[in-house]
């Protein structure tokens, strides 16, 4: 069988030794019913600690399973029968527990989206695929580590200033064009206040304050039929269409930002804003912050206001982000590496 599970499902099964939803026949396909406790513990140590709340793991357990890419989705087939298909933006890892085949296209897509592929032999992981294009120079990495020690707050402030400023620009656009009162001036005030804080904790606090104002404003712009109550990152069956579309958009944005970070020689795991954690591409998440609102949110808001039904159509959502402005993202990555190498001020991307 091939199982797709979230971190919450795994934790629930693991802690109770599968004495939970595993007992319900209708849900057995989604849990680790036949996995030994020893194997579960190994998987937990190897993969689960790095699993973001909005990602899933695909387990390949059936002998002879074949993974390929069809219509942009990672698809599992057994004897030419489709067992499941999943968007790469939803995946954190693919764990292969038995003899199976994986096409080179799956490996390519996994590389582009930062999906780990882990191979197990019995109860032991014996291989993990990492991107071949990962090629940062030693000089850049040393400077990046030095900047991480000495300029962490400076860079964190720049990333979040850019994020909040661009959120303000998005809400201000709708206020000016359609006469909404979205209290965008609060975001402008918070963005300016960020430049005066002195600690990373204060930066995160201002970001959280801005998020409340921003998503409240976004909610006012969306059709009520979408059921959007606020930003939710966790992947679940009950996720509203707009949040689901946001996750897809951010996943595709992450792919481009990751490529940009690697192309300029930076280490994607050494970030300034997001805390370091094994396997976490902290710098990619840092740089993404500036682009979330102008490159993802604004497009989806426009799509939802045009037709709420289009937000529920995955094909439409994917096509919406097929033309991400890669040039601007790569330019910003070069600006970041120059600021690190030359001890210059980093200027975030500011939408107009």
Curated annotation (Swiss-Prot):
A Pfam family this chain is assigned to: Cas_Cas1
The protein's name in its UniProt record: CRISPR-associated endonuclease Cas1 1
Broad EC category: hydrolase
Superkingdom assignment: Archaea
Gene name per UniProt: cas1-1
The keyword Phosphoprotein is assigned to this record: no
Subunit relationships: Homodimer, forms a heterotetramer with a Cas2 homodimer.
Cofactor(s), by name: Mg(2+); Mn(2+)
Record key words, sorted: Antiviral defense, DNA-binding, Endonuclease, Hydrolase, Magnesium, Manganese, Metal-binding, Nuclease
